[in-house]
């Protein structure tokens, strides 16, 4: 093992998980190099007047100094806004429900980690994700972490093999509580007591307020529209389609005498379709832009399931290839609130076989009827 093979670049957020990752890798004999990505500025609790560095940079640097490791800061704010934040806004403006972490991890953060790893002569990269890697027939697969409440395999389905080959995931066999206890044992009591990070790093609070802050003319550009029922009949006014998501029940501000849910969003007509819980259910789902490690494994899997949003339970399913861009998914148990823009991630047990983005479900009944005998 040459010097490069012993070097690992860790994405350091200054939080619990990346801190534990650095310490564990050091104990395993690796020469750890840290990099903190400055993606989006949030109000700092620690910086002094005249110093504009955010908390994650300050905390990561302090940890690096204590561990005696090399530390860098990658200022990627401009690129992050142009790629990740723009995509987030664009998706909502098309009536879709994005998950920015799915795009950010493979197409942004891990790419930057690889670039910095090359610059710092590191063979490996690592993060504090709660997941593992497993090799099968010469291919690497993401495997869900042992802590089901913190498992982050859902976000990583788009990672290509060339990046997976460089990855180390030391937290995959730990629970969050075990990681906290590990830090205490190593003398990092304050770090062990740290809080959880925000689910979307660039949004504090309601995403609707964020949309307004980034698109000041959104309310005049879009304006109020109509709530309609499943027959297309207007039943009330809404504030504008970007402010609603599939499956939403709270905050609709409409009295129908019964619980109502968002069934569909039509950005072109600025309409939001409402219905009951039964109408929200689906037997089939159309997905697009898929990335599958081995298609035959997916099609022949006898224990295939799909997660249609983060933290949702896996749903048993079957998959049919429609063309090079689209798959048709048949659910084998109840599924509801199919939200275009979200990720559909396929599992065999805890192993990720691949994923895709949930497409518009317009015409799904005809597509399903034309193909139901092909499963």
Swiss-Prot record:
EC number: 2.8.1.13
Keyword NAD attached: no
Any one Pfam family match given in the protein's UniProt record, by short name: tRNA_Me_trans_M
Disulfide bonds: 104-201
Region named Interaction with tRNA: 150-152, 309-310
Keyword Repeat: no
Subcellular localization: Cytoplasm
Catalysed transformations (reactions): S-sulfanyl-L-cysteinyl-[protein] + uridine(34) in tRNA + AH2 + ATP = 2-thiouridine(34) in tRNA + L-cysteinyl-[protein] + A + AMP + diphosphate + H(+)
Active-site residues, as the UniProt record annotates them: 104 (nucleophile), 201 (cysteine persulfide intermediate)
CDD domains hit by this protein: MnmA_TRMU-like
SUPFAM superfamilies xref list: Adenine nucleotide alpha hydrolases-like
Entry's Gene Ontology molecular function annotations: ATP binding; tRNA binding; tRNA-uridine 2-sulfurtransferase activity
Family matches, as InterPro entries: MnmA-like (IPR004506), MnmA-like_C (IPR046885), MnmA-like_central (IPR046884), MnmA-like_central_sf (IPR023382), Rossmann-like_a/b/a_fold (IPR014729)
Signal peptide limits: none
Superkingdom to which the source organism belongs: Bacteria
Site (Interaction with tRNA) residue list: 129, 342
Keywords: ATP-binding, Cytoplasm, Disulfide bond, Nucleotide-binding, RNA-binding, Transferase, tRNA processing, tRNA-binding
Binding-site residues for ATP, renumbered to this chain: 11-18, 37, 128
Single biological process term from Gene Ontology: tRNA wobble position uridine thiolation
Record-level GO cellular component terms: cytoplasm
Function: Catalyzes the 2-thiolation of uridine at the wobble position (U34) of tRNA, leading to the formation of s(2)U34.
Family: Belongs to the MnmA/TRMU family.
The protein, known as: tRNA-specific 2-thiouridylase MnmA 3
Species this protein is from: Phocaeicola vulgatus (strain ATCC 8482 / DSM 1447 / JCM 5826 / CCUG 4940 / NBRC 14291 / NCTC 11154)
Lineage: Bacteria, Pseudomonadati, Bacteroidota, Bacteroidia, Bacteroidales
């Amino acid at each position: 093992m040459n010097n490069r093979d012993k070097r690992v670049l860790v994405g350091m957020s200054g939080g619990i998980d990346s801190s534990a990752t650095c310490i564990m890798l050091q104990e395993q004999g690796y020469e750890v190099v840290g990099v903190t990505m400055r993606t989006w500025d949030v109000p700092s609790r620690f910086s002094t007047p005249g110093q504009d560095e955010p908390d994650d940079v300050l905390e990561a640097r302090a940890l690096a100094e204590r561990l005696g490791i090399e530390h860098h800061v990658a200022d990627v704010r401009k690129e992050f806004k142009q790629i990740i934040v723009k995509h987030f806004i664009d998706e909502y403006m098309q009536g879709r429900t994005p998950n920015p972490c799915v795009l950010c991890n493979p197409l942004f953060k891990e790419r930057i980690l690889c670039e910095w790893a090359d610059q710092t002569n590191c063979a490996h990269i690592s993060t504090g994700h709660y997941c593992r890697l497993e090799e099968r027939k010469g291919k690497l697969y993401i495997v869900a972490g042992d802590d089901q409440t913190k498992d982050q395999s859902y976000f990583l389905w788009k990672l290509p093999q060339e990046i997976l080959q460089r990855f180390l995931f030391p937290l995959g066999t730990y629970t969050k509580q075990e990681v906290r206890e590990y830090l205490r044992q190593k003398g990092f009591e304050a770090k062990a007591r740290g809080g959880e990070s925000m689910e979307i790093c660039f949004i504090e609070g309601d995403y609707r307020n964020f949309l307004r802050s980034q698109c000041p003319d959104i309310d005049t550009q879009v304006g109020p529209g109509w709530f309609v029922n499943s027959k297309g009949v207007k039943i009330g006014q809404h504030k504008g389609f970007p402010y609603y998501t599939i499956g939403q029940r709270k905050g609709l501000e409409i009295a129908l005498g019964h619980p109502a849910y968002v069934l569909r969003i039509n950005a072109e007509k600025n309409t939001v379709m409402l219905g009951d819980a039964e109408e929200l259910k689906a037997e089939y789902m159309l997905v697009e832009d898929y990335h599958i490690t081995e298609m035959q494994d997916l099609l022949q899997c006898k224990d295939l399931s799909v997660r249609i949003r983060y933290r949702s339970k896996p749903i048993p399913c079957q998959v049919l290839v429609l063309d090079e861009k689209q798959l048709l998914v048949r659910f084998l148990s109840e599924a509801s609130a199919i939200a275009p823009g979200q990720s559909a991630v396929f599992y065999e047990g805890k192993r990720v076989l691949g994923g895709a983005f949930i497409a518009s479900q317009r015409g799904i009944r005809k597509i399903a009827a034309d193909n139901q005998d092909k499963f």
